[in-house]
Amino acid sequence: MSEIQVEVCFTDKLESVRVGGKPMEIPKAVKAKPVEEWFEPAAGRVKWGGLGAEIKEMDFGGEKDAAYSFLFNGPEDKKQEFMECVERFCLGEEAQQETKKKTVQDYLQEAKKNQQAGNAEMAFQQYMVAARDYGHPEAQFEVARCYQNGTGVEKSEENALVWYKKAAEQCDAEAQCALGECYYQARGVEKDDKEARRWYEAAATQGNVTAQYMTGRLYAELSYNVAAVKWYTKAAEQECPEAQYELGVCYEAGDGVGKDEAKAAELYRKAAVQGYAEAQNELGACYSNGTGVAKDLEQAFECYRKAAKQGNVKAQYNLGVCYAIGGGVTKDPVQAAEWSARAAEQGFAAAQYNLGYFYRNGEGVEKDPKKAAMWYEKAAEQGFAEAQYMLGYCYNIGVGVEKDTSKAVFWYRKAAEQGNAGAQYELGECYYYGNGIDENETEAVKWYQKAAEQGDTDAQFALGKCYYYGNGTEVNYETAARWIQKAAEQGNADAQNLLGDCYCYGYGVEPNNEESAKWYEKAANQGNTKAQYSLGRCYRNGTGKRKDLAEAVKWYEKAAEGGNADAQNSLGYCYEVGEGVTEDLAKAAKWYRESAENGNEVAQCNFGLCYEYGKGIKKDLAEAAVWYDESAEHGYARAQFKIGLFYDKGYGVAQNKEEAAKWYRKAADQGDADAQCNLGYCYKKGEGVTKDPVRAAELYRKSAEQGNATAQYNLGICYEYGNGVTLLKATAAEWYRKAADQGDSDAQYKLGVFYENGYGVTQDKEQAMQWYKKAAEQGNESAKNAIDGMQGGGLGTAVAAGAALGGAALLWKILRG
């Protein structure tokens, strides 16, 4: 006689009946009835002969006297009611006895057989009987797993938790470990790390390797590193690769155990041999950096490759780096981009940043600014500072995205707040120039300072300039020089040039021509045109360098060819006067023109002089006037005087005394002595201005005190005749002498008159004759006539007269002949 098992599944109603593994068709109306009514035939149109009858009608190979065993999955009270009904409705004492005789091991074995046969639902029901009716911990654990995975029953993490707890409370190590995971991963219950640690540690104490690893991990999360090491060690000794890896991390960092990089590398190796990708990657890092092992880039590459092929995102990133830089493998931009892309597509920010770099520069992929910006953005949104900085750059200049300076500021700030020095500098620039944000030099200085303190050379130089010029902070040359020097020492050419200026003029440092020239030379050798020009000046003037005009010209030429307007002007001067080169007026005019066209006001004036006097270019007063006017509009005093003179005389422009006076005044206000003299003349004569002798005398005095001979002569006239000043012959004589000493023939003649007649000086005809002669030698007709007059009237003794007459006659002949 064979045994046929009847399985009944009940929740709040009859769910199913399986007879010998075959499902029974049960009308819905029957399923909802009380237990006792299952055994009664249905009334009306429902086809149901009662559970007993339906069981017997199922075909099992013609067996007439089969014995039935019953398995009821459901609440205990319903089970009892069901078994009473089985007995009452005469399914057989033998069947009932068979059911009662089954042991928990029978259920467990049958459940496992059903599992192997793929009959998950039957396996679950058998595990449930053993778990519920017999309280068997293994069965409780299996029931929990079925609920957790939805195997043979509807998935329910809450029910899984209930059964894991039942088994765990009976000290089942696997259940304790699983229960710890439920609390750790918040499966069917709120996350509770403390409760998770309690159950993991209970299982760990029984030797469960997974629980030992997880106990160590939870202690590590609390920074209880000694306890973490203890449990990692226990799990590692059982060859748990995860624990070996984590223990290696502890040894490498010295967390909870003495630092031992060699031990760390060995633990990584053990885990790596087992194929643990995280350890393979970390072992690669050890070989890359020589941490605990001899540096070996080829070995590092192999470790990265193994981990990368398993999908380890860090290893894929590292493998991309190896291919990018040729680390342990032949440099291959295509492979670099490919592996970076694999990691990037998994969301690894550093790889996304690198992939953006590859697209930006066209390395290993076709250049694509839009894709570059896209990958930068993906990394930036994960908080990757370098990507935030580069995304800011993209928005700042409109590369791969539409230009948007406010977005640039947004991303620069994100990166800057994470300490990215480049972004801090750029944010400072945005504040300094009002780019994408309101201009704020004080805020600019703050960000420059942050970047400068991290060694960013551009920021160091920018900060130095702020202190140098007093932008956003008080002028402080000492602080300026300190920051400028830091940037200069890192090779920043602009900083080297400005440091040269500091040493040249003593800004923040002691003046030192040799140091100045040294820094100019460093910058000049990097192609800095300002420094090349300044170095040329050092050689021209012999300051900090031996005087060498040819060397000066060499550096002027380098700077001039680089477009430096000051150097172009100086080179023009060298060619004009033959200083360090052979005189060449055509080349002089050429370089003056280039400098003038670059906006150099001195060169504009010099180029005007070329046109005025036909130096190296055809004489053209109208063109001269154009360039004088251009220079004058730029505020160059000498050009203002020249254009004033042109308007005064009508050279190249229509004569206009008012315009002349206007330009004389502009130049005079800047202290130009010639302009002061001529403006004085305008006031004396009332040309272009209202006649004003007092103002005229004031201007003559300003010019005269600067040594202008014509003004000294004119001021002498003012004092001689009392024009605009009190008449003072002695003062007139003083100013005539100053002009006469500079070779002014009219002043020399006047001084002769004063000595001959004793005006403002003691009469002295010998002195008078000497000054007349000086004036006459320059062709002064009045002086010649005065000499003739004095010779006719006699002078001194006969000997003296003869000597004087002889000398005068000889001189006269030379001048008149």
Give the ranges of each region predicted by the language model:
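Short helix-capping/linker turns of helical repeat alpha-solenoids
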Residues: K102, N114, D133-H136, N149-T151, ...
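Non-Sec secretion/translocation targeting segments of pathogen effectors
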Residues: M1-V6, M24, R816-G817
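TPR/TPR-like (Sel1-like) alpha-helical repeat modules
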Residues: E766-E781
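Hydrophobic face of amphipathic alpha-helices that form TPR/SEL1-like repeat modules
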Residues: D106, E110-N114, A130, E142-N149, ...
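Short hydrophobic alpha-helical membrane-entry/anchor segments
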Residues: Q791-T797, A808-G817
